[in-house]
């Protein structure tokens, strides 16, 4: 039997940090210095915790990962949490596995709204924080100010006296050093290891009781199938042990454990037996779902289901019906798209997928635009083709009143842009909650704004601040609907009237009508949007027209054609840009924007129908 000493030397901790505050780098350094990687400070791929391509590219952590460190006879399980509120479903489950949280805050930025979201959840779980002020060596670092901000945030979140009595460690994760004073850092991360060991309580568990654990994460491996990950609540587990699985509806079935896998560094290894308090992965139980309880066959007791925040944004995923459908993607049918969405549901708990009366269309709901755009981007990289509609917020009936979701927004801008940003947010029904000038020419603004007011705002915001502004948002609450339309696009679009190759000569003539989105010699189709009109109406244009060569002598007299650089949209920008009658066509090679109705006649007919119904 694993003795009591071992449990006393076990620590389970989650890391919370805002995007780009250095959490992943911090974990890398802890792994290296603890000697968990063979060579301390050896050749380790940077940002080891971000395993998904998209995560490394965007620098955000989407899926929570587990890792374990051995340090001076102690075993520290570290679980990474996503820093973004759109992945709130992940956060809830992680917190159910740990006994404390490590809050990493940038020594210049201070706490951000995403950190606020996860910290609030951690306090609700009764966890005590350890605060790490990171990047203390960066220019402009103001660690004392940041500590005050963190304290104020904790008070606002209703922290208990115990939670407010938190230890503070100052660090520079990039250099791998930490200390108890920001002027006096040690040679390595030892002060942080010591703080974790001293301040995190060992798991309070019953070792001799019958086995019980809850699945809080899932993984999949082609060789062993579904892998369930969770913390053992009580008792112990061995490979080949018979167990009972209880799902969230209370239905039970029998199973037999395959392997029991422990974590060390970023690897998993097989264990002969694992005990209460440890975070393990188990195989061999077939289809598992998050929140399932696995327990001893003689003591069938379910643990309470994990609650997950409801989705706030919905959009339609449709089969690609454009004339170029199937040219670039590997998976294009509705069956393939539905299978992929159902596979995503297994581990992406905050996602909802509903079939609609139209077999080629699925309604997909999630925690926010980012949550859904990450899924679309992953599908696109895997070879899927699909079309997606404009995101819409999900309204709820609460006590007989229709309510809409609101977001908390933190904006950091230069003072010269403050007026135009505040005006734009006012038009989108935002309410100012706080305004903090930093005395160095920048201002931090806190807003509460309806979620629909933020859809499509980020692009405008970047233009307004010439790319210097920072904008972070996280779901706040549901409240009464604010009247009126919000965030309608001001400009119309230029629509191609035929299918073929766009010619430079035609595009040159269209430049004065607005901004183009395509280069010359690109294949386009009828109904594809090729530019942004400078006025508010849509314009159907011919971009295939070559130069007439009737009068031979004059044919070369024109000035050379000069085309301005076209506007190129990323996936998120395209989703924010489109209107209700438009779709974003997503393929592994391209992102195109199109009208739902491709021909001008169909669009006119649809317009006539809507105007006649609205006049009656």
UniProtKB/Swiss-Prot annotation:
A 50S ribosomal subunit assembly protein with GTPase activity, required for 50S subunit assembly at low temperatures, may also play a role in translation. Binds GTP and analogs. Binds the 70S ribosome between the 30S and 50S subunits, in a similar position as ribosome-bound EF-G; it contacts a number of ribosomal proteins, both rRNAs and the A-site tRNA. It catalyses: GTP + H2O = GDP + phosphate + H(+). This is Large ribosomal subunit assembly factor BipA. It comes from Haemophilus influenzae (strain ATCC 51907 / DSM 11121 / KW20 / Rd). InterPro entries: BipA, BipA_C, BipA_GTP-bd_dom, BipA_II, BipA_III, BipA_V, EFG_III/V, EFG_V-like. It comes from the Bacteria. Monomer. Residues 8-204 form the tr-type G domain. Belongs to the TRAFAC class translation factor GTPase superfamily. Classic translation factor GTPase family. BipA subfamily. GO terms for molecular function: GTP binding; GTPase activity; guanosine tetraphosphate binding; ribosome binding; rRNA binding; tRNA binding. Pfam families: BipA_C (PF21018), EFG_C (PF00679), GTP_EFTU (PF00009), GTP_EFTU_D2 (PF03144). Its EC number is 3.6.5.-.
């Amino acid at each position: 039997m694993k003795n009591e000493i071992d449990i006393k030397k076990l620590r389970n901790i989650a890391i919370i940090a805002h995007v780009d505050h250095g959490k992943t780098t911090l974990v890398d350094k802890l792994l290296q210095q603890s000697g968990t990687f063979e060579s301390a400070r050896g050749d380790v791929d940077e940002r080891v915790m971000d395993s998904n391509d998209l995560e490394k590219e965007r620098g955000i952590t989407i899926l929570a990962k587990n890792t374990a460190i051995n340090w001076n006879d102690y075993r520290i399980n570290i679980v990474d949490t996503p820093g973004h509120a759109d992945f709130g479903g992940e956060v809830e489950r992680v917190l159910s596995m740990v006994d404390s949280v490590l809050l990493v805050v940038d020594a210049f930025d201070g706490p951000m709204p995403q950190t606020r979201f996860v910290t609030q959840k951690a306090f609700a779980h009764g966890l005590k924080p350890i605060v790490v002020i990171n990047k203390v060596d960066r220019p402009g670092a103001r660690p004392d100010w940041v500590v005050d901000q963190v304290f104020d945030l904790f008070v606002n979140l209703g922290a208990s006296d115990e939670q407010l009595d938190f230890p503070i460690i100052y660090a520079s994760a990039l250099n791998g050093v930490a200390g108890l004073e920001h002027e006096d850092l040690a040679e390595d991360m030892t002060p942080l290891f010591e703080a974790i060991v001293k301040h995190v309580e060992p798991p309070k568990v019953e070792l001799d009781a019958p086995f019980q654990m809850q699945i809080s994460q899932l993984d999949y491996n082609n060789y062993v199938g579904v892998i369930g990950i969770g913390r053992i609540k009580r008792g112990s587990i061995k490979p080949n042990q018979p167990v009972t699985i209880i799902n969230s509806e209370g239905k039970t079935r029998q199973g037999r454990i395959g392997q029991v896998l422990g974590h060390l560094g970023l690897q998993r290894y097989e264990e002969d037996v694992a005990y209460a308090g440890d975070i393990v992965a188990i195989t061999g139980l077939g289809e598992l779902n998050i929140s399932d309880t696995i327990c001893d066959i003689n003591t069938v007791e379910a643990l309470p289901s994990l609650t997950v925040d409801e989705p706030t944004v919905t959009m339609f995923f449709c089969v690609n019906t454009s004339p170029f459908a199937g040219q670039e993607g590997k998976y294009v049918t509705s069956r393939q798209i539905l299978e992929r969405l159902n596979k995503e549901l297994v581990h992406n708990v905050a996602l909802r997928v509903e079939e609609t009366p139209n077999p080629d269309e699925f309604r997909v709901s999630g925690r926010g635009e980012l949550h859904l755009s990450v899924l679309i981007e992953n599908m696109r990289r895997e070879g899927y083709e699909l079309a997606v509609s404009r995101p819409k917020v999900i309204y709820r009936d609460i006590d007989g009143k229709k309510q809409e979701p609101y977001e908390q927004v933190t904006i950091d801008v230069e003072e010269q842009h403050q007026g135009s940003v505040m005006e734009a947010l006012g038009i989108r029904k935002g309410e100012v909650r706080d305004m903090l000038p930093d005395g160095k020419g920048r201002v931090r603004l806190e807003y509460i704004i309806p979620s629909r007011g933020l859809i499509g705002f980020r692009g405008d915001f970047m233009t307004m601040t010439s790319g210097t502004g920072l904008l972070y948002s996280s779901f706040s609450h549901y409240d009464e609907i604010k009247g009126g339309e919000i965030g309608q696009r001001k400009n119309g679009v230029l629509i191609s009237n035929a299918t073929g190759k766009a010619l430079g000569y035609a595009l040159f003539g269209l430049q004065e009508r607005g901004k183009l989105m395509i280069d010359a010699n690109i294949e386009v189709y009828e109904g594809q949007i090729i530019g942004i009109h400078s006025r508010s109406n849509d314009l159907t244009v011919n971009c295939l027209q070559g130069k007439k060569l009737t009068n031979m002598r004059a044919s070369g007299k024109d000035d050379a054609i000069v085309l301005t650089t076209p506007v190129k949209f990323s996936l998120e920008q395209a989703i924010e840009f489109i209107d209700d009658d438009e779709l974003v066509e997503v393929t592994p090679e391209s992102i195109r924007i199109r009208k739902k109705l491709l021909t001008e006649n169909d669009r006119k007919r649809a317009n006539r129908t809507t105007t006649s119904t609205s006049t009656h």
